[in-house]
Amino acid sequence: METNQLSSNNLLLDLHAEMVQLPKSFRDSVCKECGWSEATFYRKAKGTYPFSNAERDKILAVGDGLLKRIRDRSNKYRGR
């Protein structure tokens, strides 16, 4: 998960840009961590396929990391 610099001093524009990228960042990170193709990601997302404990832990870690990134991004504006 890459960390981007603040693109502007515009809170709304910056957080919007970050959130628009969230689904792609989540998918790409889960695929990388789990060793899946994009097709496997969507097949598992739409089906009732079971996840291994390792996959479950990686999916949760990716989600937590992305949420932390957005929280950290918004906190940069709180100190201004």
Regions found by a protein language model. Name each.
Residues 1-23, 27:
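A short, Lys/Arg-rich alpha-helix, primarily the initiator
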Residues 24, 34-36:
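A broad helix-preferring feature
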Residues 27, 43-44, 56:
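Basic side chains
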Residues 30-31:
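The alpha-helix within a helix-turn-helix
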Residues 36-51:
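Recognition helix of helix-turn-helix/homeodomain-like DNA-binding domains
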Residues 74-80:
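Short acidic DE-rich linear segments
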